[in-house]
Amino acid sequence: MIRSHERQAVAKATQPIVDREPIRSMKPGLALAALGIVFGDIGTSVLYSLQTVFSMENHAVRPTHGDVMGIISMIFWSILLVVCVKYVIFVMRADNDGEGGILALMALVRRLMASHKGTGMTALLLGIVGAGLFYGDSFITPAISVMSAVEGLTVANPDAEKIVLPASVVILTLLFIVQRRGTEVIGKAFGPVMATWFLTLAALGIPWIIHHPVIITALSPHWAILFSIERPAMAFIAMGAVVLTITGAEALYADMGHVGAPSIRLAWFGLVLPCLLINYLGQGAMILSHPDWIDNPFFRMAPDWATIPLVTIATMATVIASQAVISGAFSMSSEAARLGLLPRLGVRHTSKSEGGQIYIPEVNWTLFIGVLALILIFQTSSKLATAYGLAVTGTFLLTTSLFLVLAHRAWHWPMWALIFFGVIVGGVELSIFSANLLKIASGGWIPLLFATIVVIIMTTWRRGTAYIAKQRQDDEGPLDDFLNWMHETKPTRVPGLAVYPHPGRATTPLALLNNLRFNHVLHEHNIIISIVVENVPHVRHVNRIEKVDLGRPTDGITYIACHVGFTDSQDVPKALALAAAKCPWLKDHLDEAIYYLSLVDVKRDEPQQGAHMAGWRKMLYITMSRNQADRTRVFRIPRTRAVVMGEAVAL
């Protein structure tokens, strides 16, 4: 959380229309919920991290005393600096109205830097790239997590190797199929299951630590330093696998809005961190005792009779981790669409009580196809690990960059503190990122490809939308001119209420112009309503409605701006119901309102006229524009009372 003087600095940059919601208190119940929502990714990394370290580059890192102690030391200090210091202690204090994640941080920085156009655009670009990298990792996490759990069967029976691939495909297929029904019922069990999982991790590690207590000395940083000095090339390569132990760090920040920062900190320091460290120390102690068990050190920690139960709970934990990633992709996509970075999406709410539980078919099936392709291409978790890490370390660096801007501009950190944080934390992250560059040729290019596609889509949509908005303004003309024309012509009036959703109050809605052009009538009451998305996650109901009477009192034209956060619904009928407090006459007309939607049919212009955008990007924008979600669904408008009118605009 942000300290009082820091929160005041942030509040100065907040628009008056926006109020902060109460911050959640630290409750054990929320901490238990956090185990199921937040810690799935980082909690299941124990399955494949050390296995990957000792399998990279044809087993270049050996299970010797020095190498094992060095690796465990690197893991401990990476978790301590990146997860504990950076995210849990500092970054999670940079909440945007209680929400976290790189898009929320980007929106917060842009609001702070509103008067610095160049810095604001840089923050926007960093946010877009960070979102792209997040999507790149979203394809890998479900695949590597589930496969690594199912591979535990091969420890009990080597012949089970042939069922790992089909079993993983079946589990993930079922997971993506059930998304449309939501996880409200089974989601209540996620916290207890993950609590059991973390206690199991500790139970597996303790006996091996007792058997080989020297492993505890690996917590000293001198082992990592010694390993780096004696075998610098191997230490650099190992950093590419050590990152697997912290890949879920960004989730702690991104999911902060669900359960609150205090609950995440309580769960992290109270259970997750101790259990993870005990398990990693236990795996290290076991490898010191049995160097030949590096093929699957996690499952080899358990006695033979416990292998099948361990595979079962590991599979449950990885499914929960995958569910968290999928839900995160849904949430980020919804936020990106409301921030104008993606087209309108068909968001479906899967819970009547939890507004954050949503389902987006386009995102769900895109993820499923990508995850399935990765499983079929790589076929084992160890091979898939070679593609994992580059995108997430890129996200680490981008989050650090945005955080330092916030710390400097809003919290007024002294320069020495900024440099110290940047050198220590940023230096570790830059080293890990550099090590992961070695993975590009062996599969690391795949998440980068996914990320690049997302960045192209977001930048194309934003640029195309800005151009179309300018063209649309020229076609619509100033609203003041329309009001003057209306006074002169005095069009025929008909009873009822006409509602015109429209981006702003400066111009005349196309649907209003066309309604007069073709029907030659104007309703008795007319409302032009704009959904204004603020750079905050939530706007309280009491602060949402801004009402302006246009023209003369007898004109019957009212402008309403409904301010919402980028995680709030864009429900137009609900906004009108809120506006009734400021428009008493509105209550009697809500049930009979007719909604006139302005449709802009984007067409490609002549090649010589289109220097503002490449031809292929125009086609991409037009395709997205024509296939985006129906606005009646996005605005929750009854289809039986919706009329669509508009015209073509050249891109």
Swiss-Prot record:
It is found in: Cell membrane. One of its GO terms (molecular function) is symporter activity. The keyword Acyltransferase does not apply. It is a multi-pass membrane protein. It catalyses: K(+)(in) + H(+)(in) = K(+)(out) + H(+)(out). GO terms for cellular component: plasma membrane. Keywords: Cell membrane, Ion transport, Membrane, Potassium, Potassium transport, Symport, Transmembrane, Transmembrane helix, Transport. The chain crosses the membrane at residues 30-50, 71-91, 124-144, 158-178, 190-210, 233-253, 268-288, 310-330, 358-378, 387-407, 413-433, 437-457. It holds the Pfam family K_trans. It comes from the Bacteria. Transport of potassium into the cell. Likely operates as a K(+):H(+) symporter. HAMAP family: Kup. Belongs to the HAK/KUP transporter (TC 2.A.72) family. This is Probable potassium transport system protein Kup.
